[in-house]
Amino acid sequence: MALITVKNVSFYYEKNMVVENLSFEVNAGDYLCVVGENGSGKSTLIKGLLRLKQPESGEIAIGDGLKANEVGYLPQQTAAQKDFPGGVYEVVLSGRLSSRGIRPFYTAKDKQIAKENMELLNISDLANRCYRELSGGQQQRVLLARALCATRKLILLDEPVSGLDPLVTQEFYGTVAQLNRNANITVIMVSHDIQSAVKYATHILHLQNEQAFFGKTEEYLRTTLAKSFIGGAENV
């Protein structure tokens, strides 16, 4: 059974259609990149997958043992978030909040999971640093470790490289790809960076306020839609 099944889903804001007729599946081990122009419904879809927004019609179902609170999420960073004064370890550990439930404290298991994910992303040496003093790339690694604390199955990333320089961007994409291949973490990523999307993703979902394409990356690259979109991105 698929981790996520989206069937005939449409989203509206104040009676205005944002995206409609979405039907696709995400299976364990997939790396799905969601692409499209601004306003095409990408971030709205992510909110729907996180159950922060209910679809006007259709159904989003989770399966294969995945629980609603076992989805790691890395949102776009705001300026205020980048200036968060807390420590790195504190930020990473907060990824266990959904698992903590009503307990007023973190368990030894929570703390161990946080340390393991910091080691996985090579940021253990930053544990005692202040988050806002880190570089943009370091901050994104911290937030990725935080997202992994919530799950061992699926992470959602919404424009995770926004504002990063090209070298750091490619390093971050490489890190996510390694998590997908080596740790069997399923990835759903919203990105404007179509070149990196087709380089790393196993599947592409292209939105144009509807489902313009969903399928394997190699199939997408053969479409007129992909050639037009990639060509346009190269000229930006």
Residue ranges and their predicted role:
Residues S191-H192:
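H-loop/switch region of ABC-family ATPase nucleotide-binding domains
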Residues C130-L134, Q138:
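Conserved ABC ATPase signature
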Residues L93, A108-L126:
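Conserved ABC ATPase "signature" region
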Residues I155-D158:
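Catalytic Walker B motif of ABC-type/P-loop ATPase nucleotide-binding domains
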Residues G58-N69:
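Conserved ABC transporter NBD signature motif
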